[in-house]
Structure formats: C-alpha cells, structure tokens
Amino acid sequence: MDAIKKKMQMLKLDKENAIDRAEQAEADKKQAEDRCKQLEEEQQALQKKLKGTEDEVEKYSESVKEAQEKLEQAEKKATDAEADVASLNRRIQLVEEELDRAQERLATALQKLEEAEKAADESERGMKVIENRAMKDEEKMELQEMQLKEAKHIAEDSDRKYEEVARKLVILEGELERSEERAEVAESKCGDLEEELKIVTNNLKSLEAQADKYSTKEDKYEEEIKLLEEKLKEAETRAEFAERSVAKLEKTIDDLEDEVYAQKMKYKAISEELDNALNDITSL
C-alpha cells in the first residue's frame, strides 16, 4: 500500500509539473505576442522612415507573418498540453477511487477472516471440553465395569458358598439348623448382590444414554466446525481476490506512469519547439 501511495504522489507531482509547464507556455505565448506587437511597431516605423525601401518592408512583413504562424502553433500546442493535463487528472482520480474500493474490500475480507479464526478457536476449545468430559465418562464407565465384575465375582463366590452349604446339608444332617442359618445368610447376600447388580445395570444404562447424548453433541460440533471451515475458505478466497485486484491496480498505475512519462516527453518536445520558435523570433 505504501508503494501505491508513493506512486500516486509521484503522479500528482507530475501533474503539478505539467500545470507549471502549461503556465510557462502561456507566459511564453504572451512574450511572443509582445514580440509580435513590437515587430509590428517596428514595421510601422520602418514604413514611415523607409518608404523607398519596399523590399525591406516586405521582408519584415514576412517575418511578422511567420512569427504570427509560430505563435498560433504555440497556442495550439499549449491548448493540447492543457487538455492532456485535464485527461491525466481524470485518470488519476479514477485510479484513486478504484484503489479506495479495493482497500475497503480487502479490509472487509481481513475482518471476516479474523472472525472466522476466532470462531474456529472457540470451536476447538469446545471440542477440548467435550473430549475432557468424554474421558471422564469413560473413566466412570471403567469404574462401573470394575464394580460390575466385582459384583459378579461376589455372586459367583456366593453361589459356590451356597452349593457348599447344600452339600453340607446332605452330608451333615446333624448341622441342619446351622446350615439353614447359613443358607438364609447366603440368600440375604444374594439378594443384596442382586440389588447391587440392578443398580450397576441402571448406572450402565444411564452411562450409555449419556454417551449417546455426547455423541449427538459431538456430531453437532463437527457440523459447526465444518461450516466454520467452509466460511474460512470463503474468506480466504475473498482475500485472494482482493489481492489480485490490488495487483491489477498496481499494473494500471504503472501503465499510467508510462503514459505520464510519454506525455512529459511530448510536452518537452512542445517546449523545445516553442523555445526554437521564440529564438527564431528573437533572432529576427
């Protein structure tokens, strides 16, 4: 952008130089008019003083005529130079307007890109929170599985104890009363284990429901992240388009600089011709 602004300043400086040269051309034109008037006065004086020298008077008349023709040519060239300056002013104005529009589009694209990056960062933080929660849920599930395995082991041990009691009931009828008490204790433990098993089963079902819920949320966040990625790609595309527009503007300004240089050379040639014409008039 700094390079573009410098180029625009150079164009404005060239425009001011062209205006100064046009004003100088006007001054040269006025000087030529004064010189022409002076020649006319000298011609009149010579006509009064040298009535007999018609050849010299005719020579001075031709010189005045040539001076008038050169003056007309100088006026035409000065007019053309002024028209070129006006055209250059219009082109510079168009380039400045186009540059302003490109800067606005680029600023908008950069703002949208920044917003998309912020949204992506927020989504990433949300995903990390979900992952942490999922890890905690997995740890809870592992703990519940361990509790379930422990409950199964306890149940198996209870079954083995119950079978052992039954065998002892067959073998030891004399200890029937004691065996019945042990059986009641075992049955009570089995009931407690069954209740614990039911609780563990319910906890597992609750964990499965929570896992399904988190899975649904994860799918939703994935869709949101995908949408944000699409928006980010769109913002990047717009930014690339803005950069291409700026490059195009830079090329346009380079072309204008070439054209300004050509106009300067043209104006220089005009100035040289005008100087030559004034020198010719002065030499007369």
From Swiss-Prot:
Residues 1-65, 117-136 are annotated as: Disordered. Gene3D superfamilies: 1.20.5.170, 1.20.5.340. InterPro entries: Tropomyosin. Residues 12-40, 51-65 have a biased composition (Basic and acidic residues). Changing K128E: In CMYO23; likely pathogenic. Present in primary breast cancer tissue, absent from normal breast tissue. The modification N-acetylmethionine is found at M1. GO terms for molecular function: actin binding; actin filament binding; identical protein binding; protein heterodimerization activity; protein homodimerization activity; structural constituent of muscle. GO terms for biological process: actin filament organization; muscle contraction; regulation of ATP-dependent activity. The modification Phosphothreonine is found at T53, T79, T108, T252, T282. Residues 1-284 form a coiled coil. PANTHER family: TROPOMYOSIN. Binds to actin filaments in muscle and non-muscle cells. Plays a central role, in association with the troponin complex, in the calcium dependent regulation of vertebrate striated muscle contraction. Smooth muscle contraction is regulated by interaction with caldesmon. In non-muscle cells is implicated in stabilizing cytoskeleton actin filaments. The non-muscle isoform may have a role in agonist-mediated receptor internalization. The molecule is in a coiled coil structure that is formed by 2 polypeptide chains. The sequence exhibits a prominent seven-residues periodicity. This is Tropomyosin beta chain. It comes from Homo sapiens (Human).
